[in-house]
């Protein structure tokens, strides 16, 4: 499965304390194929991110992922923290937001 492959690649390339990957494809209208993984949310906690800004953190992750087949992936939402930042957040995960296109489509269908 693609999610497990992504997790293993990231764990191999980055010293990860915690990782969680969500398939959020069903929250979006990107693909009519319900089996396609198009949108991901990834929470990564690593002290490799110490003294690195958000852009550098994302570059580290995308560099690690560039070897993976990601033709079907349209969007990746990244939450990157050091271990201390993650503790300060009290290990809180953020709720996902439905795609605006999906909201519009549902509104039009109901009205």
Curated annotation (Swiss-Prot):
Signal peptide location: none
Family: Belongs to the BolA/IbaG family.
Protein name: Uncharacterized protein BUsg_457
PANTHER family: BOLA TRANSCRIPTION REGULATOR, BOLA-LIKE PROTEIN 1
InterPro entries recorded: BolA, BolA-like_sf, BolA/IbaG_stress_morph_reg
SUPFAM superfamilies linked to this entry: BolA-like
Domain of life: Bacteria
Residues spanning the membrane: none
Record organism: Buchnera aphidicola subsp. Schizaphis graminum (strain Sg)
